[in-house]
Amino acid sequence: MATFSQKPAEVEKKWVIIDAEGLVVGRLASIIAMRLRGKHKATFTPHVDDGDNVIVINAEKVVFTGKKYSDKVYYWHTGYAGGIKERSARQIIEGRFPERVLEKAVERMVPRGPLGRRQMKNLRVYAGSNHPHEAQQPVALDVAALNKKNVRSA
């Protein structure tokens, strides 16, 4: 029997909504990256974008384990000499765009390249509980019920 290869025209994309309140960042990002790539489907094909559209709400309420909330540092470079910049996870979550912590975690779990960039466009992350995608009728995915370690008990 020949290996199955999904054609781009045969892809069926679903809409999934995840409430990130109280969920651990890395574990949540791993599940989201798998959904975006389509690896949860039996029809997974490496060169085809057959993942789902994922909506994440309450991204400002994600949690870190251990001391990562205060100690984890995100670096970037401005392009100028001596232009290395840094922010802690705490500064970003308490700042203007707290959803970027989760976006960056997922982005670093998706392969780099044209297909990875296209798959990342299927991710919508919102800091609060409101989102403009009710018309797509997203199905709720309860990440907390998948594994007890996905939720941080304070």
From Swiss-Prot:
Family from the record: Belongs to the universal ribosomal protein uL13 family.
Highest classification ranks of the organism: Bacteria, Pseudomonadati, Pseudomonadota, Alphaproteobacteria, Hyphomicrobiales
CDD domains linked to this entry: Ribosomal_L13
GO cellular component, one term: cytosolic large ribosomal subunit
Name of the protein in question: Large ribosomal subunit protein uL13
Entry's Gene Ontology BP terms: negative regulation of translation; translation
Function: This protein is one of the early assembly proteins of the 50S ribosomal subunit, although it is not seen to bind rRNA by itself. It is important during the early stages of 50S assembly.
Top-rank taxon, per record: Bacteria
InterPro entries assigned: Ribosomal_uL13, Ribosomal_uL13_bac-type, Ribosomal_uL13_sf
Molecular function per GO: mRNA binding; structural constituent of ribosome
Source organism: Rhizobium johnstonii (strain DSM 114642 / LMG 32736 / 3841) (Rhizobium leguminosarum bv. viciae)
Gene3D superfamilies in the record: Ribosomal protein L13
This protein's UniProt keywords: Ribonucleoprotein, Ribosomal protein
Quaternary structure and interacting proteins, as annotated: Part of the 50S ribosomal subunit.
Gene: rplM
